[in-house]
Curated annotation (Swiss-Prot):
It comes from the Bacteria. Coiled coil: none annotated. InterPro entries: UPF0145_dom_sf (IPR035439), UPF0145_YbjQ-like (IPR002765). It comes from Pseudoalteromonas atlantica (strain T6c / ATCC BAA-1087). This is UPF0145 protein Patl_2194. The lineage of its organism: Bacteria, Pseudomonadati, Pseudomonadota, Gammaproteobacteria, Alteromonadales. Belongs to the UPF0145 family.
Length: 108
């Protein structure tokens, strides 16, 4: 499946707009990881635990987006937008929301 942030795909013709698709993932933050991340931030290191959680959440979101697009008969998603939100009590959770337009396209 082709997935792109652009509104069109070079070399392809959009035959049908299937609809808006969304993939979301909400990940809880572990208290111990939060403590170690804060220590790393103080000493200037990168927080690998948070980076791993972001990557995992993004991958889940893209899988959901693709599954929804396929269920509509699409073979591509255009205009993809990725949003990140900190949610939950005290910002204890991370939400990744990915949206786009499912389309059916063919070669030019």
């Amino acid at each position: 499946m082709i997935m792109t942030t652009t509104p069109s795909i070079e070399g392809k013709k959009i035959e049908r707009y299937c609809g808006i698709v969304v993939g979301e993932a909400v990940m809880g933050a572990n208290v111990f990881r939060d403590i170690f991340a804060a220590i790393r931030d103080v000493v200037g290191g990168r927080s690998g635990a948070y980076e791993d959680e972001l990557t995992n959440a993004r991958q889940i979101g893209f899988r959901e987006l693709e599954a929804e697009a396929r269920s509509m008969g699409a073979n591509a998603v255009v205009g993809i937008d990725i949003d990140y939100e900190v949610v939950g009590k005290g910002g204890s959770m991370l939400m990744v929301s990915i949206s786009g337009t499912a389309v059916s396209c063919s070669d030019l």
